[in-house]
Design a protein with these regions (language model features):
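Positively charged n-region of N-terminal signal peptides that target proteins for export
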Residues: 1-4
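Active-site-adjacent loop/helix micro-motif of nuclease/hydrolase catalytic cores
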Residues: 42-43, 75-84
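Bacterial signal peptide processing site
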Residues: 17-20
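C-terminal motif of bacterial Sec signal peptides marking the signal peptidase cleavage site
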Residues: 12-15
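Extracytoplasmic electrostatic interaction patches
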Residues: 36-37, 82-166
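Conserved beta-strand segments of the P-loop GTPase G domain that flank and frequently precede/overlap
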Residues: 32-33, 68-72, 95-98
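Short, well-ordered secondary-structure micro-motifs within conserved domains or adaptor modules
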Residues: 61-75
Length: 166
């Protein structure tokens, strides 16, 4: 009887640990400034772009992509004042992936990722989606949390579901 309970317990644990959260919504095309995520999902297409491409041809990027993702390797340059208007005038959501300082260093003039005060900006979030609507004089931000690095698939799924809904 103990052996049966042990075997059933092990099967239950194995079944739970293999639970992978995978985005299965509409196909999304995401422009990436920085490192392309290592994500294997046929519904998500990543394409590398530069900050200059994004700033010089915002209309083309907004028309051909569902979102722009900026990754940590580009945060310092991406937080330069010359890009603030680009983010605030973008017609598509911007994902600041793995930014503990949220979107503020990128959307506020006179502030860079390096100089932004971490203690005052850290709300515990891992990633922020930012969307500004100049015509409506409105900006929205959605925060995503990652408590366990093993749950990165779940984080991506939530981010992509939000992008799909916008």
């Amino acid at each position: 009887m103990k052996k049966i309970l042990l075997i059933l317990s092990l099967l239950f644990l194995v079944a739970c640990s293999n639970d992978e959260a995978k985005y299965d919504g509409a196909p999304l095309k995401i422009a990436v400034v920085g490192d392309i995520p290592k994500l294997n999902n046929e519904k998500i297409h990543f394409e590398s772009i530069s900050l200059n491409e994004f700033s010089e041809d915002t209309l083309h990027i907004s028309t051909n992509f569902d979102a722009v993702m900026i990754t940590p390797m580009m945060f310092e340059e991406a937080s330069e004042d010359r890009f603030v208007k680009v983010y605030n005038n973008s017609k598509i959501p911007i994902i600041f992936f793995d930014s503990t300082k949220r979107h503020f260093p990128f959307t506020s003039e006179g502030l860079t990722y390096e100089t932004a005060n971490w203690e005052s900006l850290n709300n515990g979030s891992h990633t922020t989606i930012y969307l500004s609507d100049v015509d409506e004089n409105r900006e929205d931000a959605w925060y995503f949390y990652l408590k366990n690095e093993k749950k990165l698939d779940t984080l991506y799924k939530k981010i992509f579901q939000k992008i799909e809904s916008l």
